[in-house]
From Swiss-Prot:
This is Syncoilin. Residues 338-445 are annotated as: Coil 2. The lineage of its organism: Eukaryota, Metazoa, Chordata, Craniata, Vertebrata. Residues 193-219 are annotated as: Linker 1. May link the dystrophin-associated glycoprotein complex (DAPC) to intracellular desmin (DES) filaments. Interacts with DES and DTNA. Residues 1-43, 446-470 are annotated as: Disordered. It comes from Mus musculus. Disulfide bonds: none annotated. Keywords: Coiled coil, Cytoplasm, Intermediate filament, Phosphoprotein. The modification Phosphoserine is found at S32, S314. Residues 298-337 are annotated as: Linker 2.
């Protein structure tokens, strides 16, 4: 009887592959939904490491496990399955224990692919023992009688062990290839995620640069506003002084107008006085001529009296003229002097005011030019700020659209991952159900073999008697 050590050696290999199998689940979850649709249950079971794809294909794709076992066991009784009787069926096959690839290989290698004939008719998974016995009898009746080897004393041959080892090496190579594919897919996923992360970082950097430019523009705007406020204050002061000087100029102009009116009045008065003086001179000249004529005439008594009277009148006239002249001089000379002084002062003040106004105009010209330049700069800065805001709004809108696109892609990837996880869970449930069915079939296999041994021995005895009778 062969020991089950080669089969236990496969347990260590299976245990060494279990971490890789567990690590392959995130890779399956991270794949896209399109890739998930190409997976089938058989490939998923091969990725899990418990049942190989070739083993499942070898057992038959058109029927289930029960049909394959019955056809493999009863088509050729000479090549029966080896079962280790030193272990109890409950210990060897548990429902909770995953199916081992080595056990599947031990079941497969007993029957060659050329000897397996898969029935095309569908077979019900739950057959009664009587139906199984009927099929065995029909199969044995169609086959020639062959000697039944003793299953208890026939161990595994060296060729079977070599084939098992080769098959195990193939499984190990397949697992390593799957691990390489998993690493490659993880690397591709990382490479696919890197552009999105770089785009997000670039967007954040652009937003920070836009905020910096905005802050710098605001600082420049505040500085220009402060300069404009200072220039406005200076301009206000200059305007205030200009208005004050203009008021003084108007006052001086009014004084000059008043002085001109006084001058005209004095000129008119002087003309009147000159006319009166001329008239008085004419009258005096006439009287003088008359008196001279009287003097030239022969003197008479009346003439002496007239001469005395004329001398008296002449003296009175001279006294009157002197008094009137002195009165006029006393009355108008101070006013004339004051008017002359005021005229000179007004002329001098007017000249000073005109000089100051000219200086202020010359000083106001660069300020006006500077104010126009500052207004132009202010308009340019406002236009630049408007353009920067528009550009920032456009960039923010573009960044938002890109962010929405990336969020949409992220949602799609998440939905694909969820679909893949759900499919993986379904595959896991299918694998567990297949493993449970396989363990159930393995548990039922010894009983079916025992039931098949009795009809086979009876058929052999009948055939042995038939040649004797002949």
């Amino acid at each position: 009887m062969a020991s089950p050590e080669p089969l236990r050696g496969g347990d260590g290999a299976r245990a060494s592959r279990e971490p890789h199998t567990e690590a392959s689940f995130p890779l399956q979850e991270s794949e896209s939904p399109k890739e998930a649709k190409t997976f089938n249950p058989e490939a998923t079971l091969s990725l899990e490491g418990t049942v190989n794809l070739e083993d499942i294909l070898y057992l038959g794709a058109s029927g289930d496990f029960e049909e394959s076992f019955y056809e493999e066991e009863y088509e050729k009784p000479a090549l029966t399955l080896f079962i280790d009787e030193s272990r109890q069926p409950d210990e060897a096959l548990g429902l909770e224990e995953p199916v081992r690839p080595e056990e599947m290989l031990s079941v497969e290698e007993s029957v060659t692919p050329d000897e397996v004939q898969i029935s095309e008719q569908p077979v019900e998974p739950a057959k009664s023992p009587t139906a199984c016995e009927g099929e065995m009898v029909a199969t044995e009746g169609s086959l020639p009688a062959q000697p039944i080897p003793n299953t208890e004393e026939d161990p595994l041959s060296v060729e079977d062990l070599e084939r098992l080892e080769a098959r195990f090496q193939q499984c190990v190579q397949a697992v390593s290839q799957l691990e390489e594919e998993r690493d490659q897919l993880i690397h591709e996923l990382v490479l696919l995620r890197e552009p999105a992360l770089q785009e997000v970082q670039q967007v954040h950097q652009d937003i920070l640069a836009a905020y910096k430019l905005h802050a710098q523009a605001e600082l420049e705007r505040d500085g220009l506003r402060e300069e404009i406020r200072t220039v406005k204050q200076k301009l206000f002061k200059v305007t205030k002084e200009c208005v004050a000087y203009q008021y003084q100029l108007e006052c001086r102009q009014q004084d000059v107008a008043q002085f001109a009116d006084c001058r005209e009045a004095l000129t008119t008065r002087a003309a009147q006085l000159s006319e009166e003086l001329t008239q008085l001179r004419d009258a005096c000249q006439k009287q003088k001529e008359q008196l001279q004529q009287q003097l030239e005439a022969p003197p008479t008594q009346s003439d002496g009296h007239f001469l005395q009277e004329s001398r008296r009148l002449s003296t009175q006239f001279e006294n009157l003229m002197a008094e009137s002249r002195q009165g006029l001089e006393e009355e108008y000379e101070p006013q004339l002097l004051r008017l002359l002084e005021r005229k000179e002062a007004g002329t001098k003040a007017l000249q000073d005011t005109q000089a100051e106004i000219q200086e202020m105009r010359e000083a106001l010209r660069p300020l006006e030019a500077e104010a126009r330049q500052l207004q132009l700069q202010n308009r340019n800065l406002e236009d630049q700020i408007t353009l920067v805001r528009q550009k920032r709004d456009e960039e923010v809108q573009q960044y938002r659209e890109q962010l929405e696109e990336m969020e949409e892609r992220q949602r799609q990837l998440r939905s694909g991952v969820q679909v893949q996880q759900q499919k993986n869970k379904e595959m896991e449930r299918l694998r567990m159900s297949l493993a449970e069915e396989l363990s159930t079939y393995k548990a039922m296999l010894p009983k079916s073999l025992e039931q098949a041994d009795a009809p086979t021995s009876q058929a052999g005895g009948v055939e042995a008697q038939s040649p004797g009778t002949v």
